[in-house]
Amino acid sequence: MLKKIPNILTIGRIIIVPFFVLAFYLPGFYGDLTALILFVVASFTDFLDGMLARMMGEESKLGELLDPIADKIIVATALILLVMDGTIRNYEVIAAIIILTREILISGLREFLAKGKIKLPVSSLAKLKTVLQMVSIALLLSGDTGNKIINFQDYNAQTIGIILLWLSAALTLFTGYDYMRKGIDHAMSEAVSYTHLTLPTKRIV
């Protein structure tokens, strides 16, 4: 049972999403607070399930499949909701589009490479990018309450959240390019290896 905990946490993160959406649209302080708590819980389980899987040596196929899907669903849902309600607006929407586009492209790349049994390891910068995304979204979800708690001169929770969103978008571009380059290199090397194996050798008469 203990070995199944990482997968249970991952599935739980997906189950949280509809409740997060519902809480986001609840009016007032408690709606904001509930949405924030659900997002923070989902973000924490992302860290926790990976850590437990490595500690137990139980990085299952199901976990490998569902974990990145769960991450992308919660982040994409939060960003779309924040754009729709105007928290992320004007040029700030570009940062959200960059993040969402990168996630779609890299997911497709991973799926393509998986057919050739090629894995792209998660880089340290990609992990930092994920942390910045989660923190920025949490700050933006905190609303007016967050602004009252975090307020340093011209910098409140919303302002800091937007700054971190742009930073995560910049890292998203960099890590996305890095993944695409590595993925193409892997695919090309596999194609060359396959060609060498399948092409008939020329006989010398």
Language-model regions, residue ranges each:
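Short juxtamembrane and helix-loop transition motifs at transmembrane-helix boundaries
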Residues: M1, G57-L62, I88
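A feature for the membrane-embedded catalytic helix bundles of lipid/isoprenoid biosynthetic enzymes
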Residues: L2-L22, L36-V40, I69-Y194
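Short, hydrophobic transmembrane alpha-helix segments
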Residues: L22-Y30
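Conserved small/polar residues in nucleotide/adenosyl-binding loops
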Residues: T195-T201
